[in-house]
Amino acid sequence: DPESRLPVSCTVFVVEDSMEGNNGIEASWRFVSHALRYGAGVAVHLSKLRPKGDQNGKGLTASGPVSFGKIYSTLNEIIRRGGHYKNGACVLHLDLDHPDIIEFITTPRSELPWVKRCVNINEVKWECASQETKDALIYGIKSGDIWLNKTKYDKNGKRIRGNVCLEVYLPSRGTCLLQHVNLGACKITDVSKGFVEGMRSLCDLHSKTG
């Protein structure tokens, strides 16, 4: 049923440190739900969330990124079980220098079974990390629970985030159109023309998916 599927491969959501708002925690649940229901993967970046136990000055205590990570995992599990299509993917990202990084790395797979975890890293973050953090990260990678993602910036110095496959870096709510042009039905003499027309169609489509 292609009419109900999204014409994109993956997308990115950077969660702001607020329950409400267009890019807040609650908005991210809706965003992730829509992506998973319609077959797109989504990379959820949680580094802006306050660490576990942090006070906001209004009598509220933060529960931390890992606690919210469990909601995304449960959301993915329920949607996969209830939907006809079961091809959504959800990856949680956290910067290496976030105060809750060790908890993020060492949380048992049984507590986050329906999401992948990825640590955003660069040379500076690695050099500044404690030995405990480095050891936990290396063990997490060896166990298959943790993936690595390089932090990157666009030409204007604005940070862009890795999507699910880590091949494309996007701003928050950006979409990746990792598609293909099938030229199997073309004659050899029509391959060039078919490729150009196919790419033009994909470019037109991509502008409608943001």
Give, region by region, the residue ranges found by the protein language model.
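Extended catalytic cores of very large enzyme megasubunits
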Residues: 1-210
